[in-house]
Amino acid sequence: MRKLLALPVFTLALAIPATAAPRREGNPELRYYADAYADHYGVPRALVRAIIAQESNWNPHALSNKGAAGLMQLMPATADLYLVRNRFSVEDNLSGGIEYLADLMTEFRGEMRLAVAAYYCGSRHIAQKGLNYRNPDVVSYVEAVRHRYQLELHERADRDIPMPGKGQ
């Protein structure tokens, strides 16, 4: 199930102090790792960033009252399934969380809304209900991630467009 990422860069123990304050858009090192794992598992970068922002606000030390932990807020059972040893490890959490998201994207044939809903509440529930899920928490979560996803797409487009008179 787990695919080893053969990039030497991932062997570094990301040196982010526990007291580092997360920023809404994420620390550049965290974004770098998130993008690299997104590329490795074939998941859109903007979707990964949107989920991380929604789940933990880019805080690798986040812990929910339900026991979800780390950047992608992995529950213990999901972490075990994806061989995540330390849910607070940036690399472990991103690798396991993004691989899980990639599996959900495959399970739901690329339908992002369903994959995001399943990321939030589990694939069994969404597989049974499909687009007919009515739980207000799930609907709200999917809408929040969709909004963040759109912001990520626009931010990326803004970065990719050269300023007039520069770089042309």
Language-model-detected regions and their locations in the chain:
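Positively charged n-region of N-terminal signal peptides that target proteins for export
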Residues: 1-4
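Sec/Tat signal peptide C-region and signal peptidase I cleavage site
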Residues: 16-20
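Catalytic glycan-binding domains that act on GlcNAc-containing polysaccharides
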Residues: 21-168
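Bacterial N-terminal signal peptides
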Residues: 6-15
